[in-house]
Amino acid sequence: MVIRGAVYRVDLGEAKRGHEQRGRRLGLVLSPSSMPWSVTTIVPTSITAQPAVFRPSMEINGQETKFLVDQIRSIDMDYLIDDPVHYLEHDELAEVEHAVARYLGL
């Protein structure tokens, strides 16, 4: 089971396809914790991506980290590595959710 609002290490693979994020990085779980699915929806992160209004930024493990809501995706649970490394506070998760809604025009 994954925890909504938790930040995990994820492996997005090494296949280079356009501008999609790849490799190992942190990812924020947005899927509901109560759903026993074989995939989970994540927002990948980056410490080097360009800032944007739809990319909330906050400190994770001592580094300023951007949440790439423009790269949201579902991945197999096997690509989550180990236990969460960070948990977003309620207001931090709300900030990311708001950015997702704005980016998707919801």
Over which residues does each language-model region extend?
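Conserved functional hotspots at enzyme active or ligand-binding sites that engage polyanionic ligands
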Residues: 1-106
